Structure formats: C-alpha cells, structure tokens
C-alpha cells in the first residue's frame, strides 16, 4: 500500500488535473463561446444579456453532459484491461479532442466536437478515484481521494483563471488549444502511474468471474449501487447548472471583470483546499455519510446564493459552494468505492458517471427553461431555488448505506 503523497498517487492526481483542465474549458469559456456564436441584445432577458438563450445554453451543456455517458463503458474497460492502461489512454484521447474543439466553426459544431472528448475525460476522472482507493489503506484513503479531487480542481481552476485574464488575447479557441500542454506532459506523468496491487492480484485469481464491461452488477451489489447512483444523480442536479453556468452568469450578466473573476477562482481554490482538508478529517472522524449529506446541503444553499442577483452574493456563493463540494469529495469518493469489491469497482464508477450525467442534464435543462420562462428580472435566482433545493432530499438515501469509516473494502465484501 502507498501513502497519499507517494509518486503513484501523485501521478494519478496529475492525470485528474489534466482531465479537469480539458473538461472545464467549456464552462470557463462559455461566455466567450456565447458572444462569438450568439448576439448580445439591449434587453433584459437572459438571451439578451448572455448572448444565447438559457434553453440553448442548457441544451448545449446537456448534450455535453450526455456525451459523458460514453465514460460508462470506458471506465468499465479498466476492469478488463487495467487501471493504468485506461487512465493514460482516455486522458490522451480526451485532451486531443479538446484541442480539436478550438477549430469549431459554430456553436453546435463546438458542442459536437467538445462532446466527443467528454467520455474519455469522464472515464479518467472516475477511474482515477478507483485507482487512488486501491493504492492506499484505510488510514490514507480519504487523503488520497482528496488529492485526486484537488488535482481535478486545480486543472479546472487553471482554465478559468487563464480565460479570465487572457480572454481578449486568446479567445475561447486559444483556451482550448492550451490543452495540448497537459497532453505533452503525459509522457512524463505516465512514469509514475502504476497498476494497483489489488487489481494485479485479482488478475492472478482464476476463480474470479470476468464480467462484461457493461454487464449486470451481481444481485448482492445492486441495492447499494442503486442508492449510490441516486445520490450521485441528486448531487449532479445541483452541480450541473451551479458549476456550468456560473461563469457566463458572472461575465455576461453580472458584468464581473476578468480580474475579479480570477480573484473569485483563486478564492474558490483556497476555499476548496480548506474544504478538502476539512472533508478528509470529517470523513475519517465524523463518517462518510454525514459528511456527504452536509456537503450536498451546502452546495444547494450556496449555489442559490451565487445566483441571487448581486455580485457579492455571486462571489461569496461560488467560493462557499466550491468549499462545500470539496468537503463532500473525499467522503463521497471513498464511500462510493469502499462499498464494492475490486472486480466490479471500475464498472460501478462507470454507472455512477452515468447517474451523474443524467442528473446534470436534468438540472441544466430545468435551470435553462426556468430562466427563460421567468423572463426579465432575477431569472437566474428563481431557476436556482427551484432547481437546487428539492435535490437536497436525495441526501436522505445515504442512510440506507452502511458506514465505511475505518474499514477496508475487504471487510465489507470478502470478494474484494
């Protein structure tokens, strides 16, 4: 077993960073994309202020999220061909397609090309957490998952900062072209990425049945998988619009400057680091389930604050929302992986990706339609309240799961 700060875990965190840089480009540059392919009007509707209607943006982002369903079979391939192979292959392909999106001739072309890169990068993110769990013991596991989440967050934050400071020089096309840098760095990162011993031991065990990549999960695991997937669905109903529309809301509607947006992202990065540290401690001392529940409630409340209509509310809500999501990440990542044995763990991660995609699609379309229907005035605030708060109810499902704090996966599933 490795410690959370050993090179194999750091290597996986760097892959998560690269995936975050590639995936978050559509979010951070959405304002520029809307201005390039849309039309800013003089009215006060969402479309006049943003450049494209809330429905158009919501549907476009929903398509990007739906494309992530392709991450389900790709993540499942890690149960057949190994964690290392799939991590490196999916990250490389996803980043290459992100670079290609820079040449998009129109909005729907942009959506189509960028959507092709979503499945491999989603698989990278999902399998990276699986590998981190398998590389570490119980005492190090929440720390390792927190490091993976931090890596993804840093990658996403870098995209947002670069866009905020250099959008006039680079435009959205330049932002996407920068994904070539982490693509090149994969040559160095791959030296640190190793196959977890838990997986290699499973490969040598000829008594273990090899299941189809997207085959049915064994009956003993289906109840837990259904509960975990429903919780992931609820979380994503919140995070889909809360994270995906916040920068176009800041830049095109609230008219926040690039420097202020960068400051908001840096502040969120600091808060996110604090949230990860707090979440890691809470996961190991308070428990996985209550920590996840608290994170869900915080994301909903602070997400609504971010869209409440004022710049201070936007900045404060975004920063605190990132902190709440970071509190959730170590506990949620550990819980979702500790509940299932090694032979199906990557496939389960794929099903969780699918549940998250469906939740995000529901949230994005609901938010976009509500913002358009509400017309003038504080349309985003109305959409946020109606979309976010009901999703908190999914947190109650956590208490149908066993608490995994302080336990090895083998203690929960002897087949693991």
Task: Show where each model-derived region lies.
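Conserved MFS/SLC helix-loop-helix module at the cytosolic interface between two early adjacent transmembrane helices
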Residues: 69-105, 286-289
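Central cavity-lining transmembrane alpha-helices of secondary-active solute carriers
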Residues: 59-75, 266-278
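C-terminal transmembrane helical hairpin of 12-TM major facilitator-type secondary transporters
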Residues: 283, 287-332
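Extracytoplasmic gate region of multi-pass secondary transporters
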Residues: 27-28, 222-273
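Helix-loop junctions at membrane interfaces in 12-TM secondary transporters
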Residues: 102-113, 169, 307-317
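Cytoplasmic helix-loop-helix junction between adjacent transmembrane helices
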Residues: 113-150
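Glycine-rich segments within core transmembrane alpha-helices of 12-TM secondary carriers
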Residues: 140-167, 352-364
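Extracellular/periplasmic helix-loop-helix junction of adjacent transmembrane segments
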Residues: 30-68, 259-260
């Amino acid at each position: 077993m490795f410690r959370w700060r050993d090179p194999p875990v750091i290597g996986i965190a760097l892959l998560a960073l690269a995936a975050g840089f590639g995936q978050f480009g559509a979010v951070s540059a959405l304002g520029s994309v809307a201005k390039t392919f849309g039309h800013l009007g003089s009215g006060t509707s969402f479309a006049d202020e943003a450049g494209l209607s809330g429905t158009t943006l919501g549907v476009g982002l929903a398509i990007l999220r739906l494309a992530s369903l392709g991450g389900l079979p790709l993540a499942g391939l890690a149960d057949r061909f190994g964690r290392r192979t799939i991590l490196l292959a999916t990250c490389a392909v996803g980043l290459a397609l992100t670079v290609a999106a820079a040449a998009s001739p129109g909005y729907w072309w942009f959506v189509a090309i960028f959507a092709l890169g979503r499945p491999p990068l989603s698989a990278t993110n999902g399998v990276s957490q699986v590998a981190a769990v398998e590389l570490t013991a119980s005492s190090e596991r929440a720390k390792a998952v927190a490091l993976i989440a931090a890596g993804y967050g840093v990658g996403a934050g870098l995209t947002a900062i670069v866009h905020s400071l250099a959008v006039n020089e680079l435009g959205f096309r330049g932002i996407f072209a920068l994904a070539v840098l982490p693509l090149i760095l994969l040559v160095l990162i791959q030296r640190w990425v190793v196959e977890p011993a838990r997986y290699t031991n499973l490969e040598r065990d000829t008594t273990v049945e090899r299941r189809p990549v997207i085959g049915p999960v064994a009956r003993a695991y289906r109840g837990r998988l259904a509960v975990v997937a429903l919780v992931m669905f609820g979380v994503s109903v919140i995070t889909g619009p809360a994270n995906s529309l916040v920068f176009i809301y800041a830049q095109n509607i609230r008219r926040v400057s690039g420097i202020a947006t960068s400051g908001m992202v840096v502040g969120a990065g600091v808060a996110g680091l604090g949230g990860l540290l707090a979440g890691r401690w809470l996961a190991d001392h308070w428990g996985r389930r209550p920590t996840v529940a608290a994170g869900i409630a915080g994301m909903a409340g602070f997400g609504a604050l971010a869209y409440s209509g004022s710049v201070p509310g936007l900045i404060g809500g975004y920063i605190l929302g990132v902190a709440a999501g970071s509190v959730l990440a170590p506990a949620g990542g550990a819980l979702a992986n500790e509940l299932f044995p090694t032979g199906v763990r990557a496939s389960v991660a794929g099903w969780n990706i699918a549940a998250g995609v469906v939740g995000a699609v529901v949230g994005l379309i609901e938010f976009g339609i509500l913002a358009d229907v509400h017309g003038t005035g504080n349309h985003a605030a109305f959409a946020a309240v109606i979309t976010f708060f009901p999703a908190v109810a999914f947190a109650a499902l956590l208490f149908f799961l066993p608490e995994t704090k302080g336990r090895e996966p083998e203690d929960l599933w002897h087949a693991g």
